[in-house]
Amino acid sequence: MSVLGNHLLNCAGFHAADRGFGIATLNENHYTWVLSRLAVELENMPCQYEGFSIQTWVENVYRLFTDRNFAILDKEGKAVGYARSVWAMISMETRKPADLLTLHGGSITDYVCDKECPISKPGRIKVTEKTPVSEYQTRYSDIDINGHVNSIKYI
């Protein structure tokens, strides 16, 4: 699952970069992307060494968040799964969410696509107990470009 998760994040990054909203462009303006939520539903998990591809599109852009969806396709191009994600652009200085519409004059909304994603939007998970579920020893290789533990390490 972590390999698929990394492919989803890379696909999102390439898609954003091709449209002028990649991490390098955001960093020039002291912003960065952070993944807030991710939901993945698969009918079939691609086997090791089996070819697959990923399509991605932006469903919505709000002031502080954007919804990005994915279709996971087998080697014949048939959808075998979908994913939905919620991303925020944060200030690298304050670490707080930043207004997505301030970058490039709000042109990020030009990339909203009217394409269906058949799975439910990821919601917040309500924590009812304050008991730790597990512990994880962070390694240097777990840290991403933002200085956070990479989202996929949580899967």
Which residues does each predicted region cover?
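Generic structural signal for alpha-helix starts
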Residues: 1, 101-102, 139, 150
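HotDog/MaoC-like acyl-thioester-processing domains
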Residues: 41-124, 128
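Short amphipathic
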Residues: 128-141
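A generic structural signal for short, non-catalytic loop/turn and secondary-structure boundary residues
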Residues: 28-33, 78, 127-131
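Short, hydrophobic/π-rich interface segment
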Residues: 151-155
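Hydrophobic, proline/glycine-rich low-complexity stretches
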Residues: 1-51
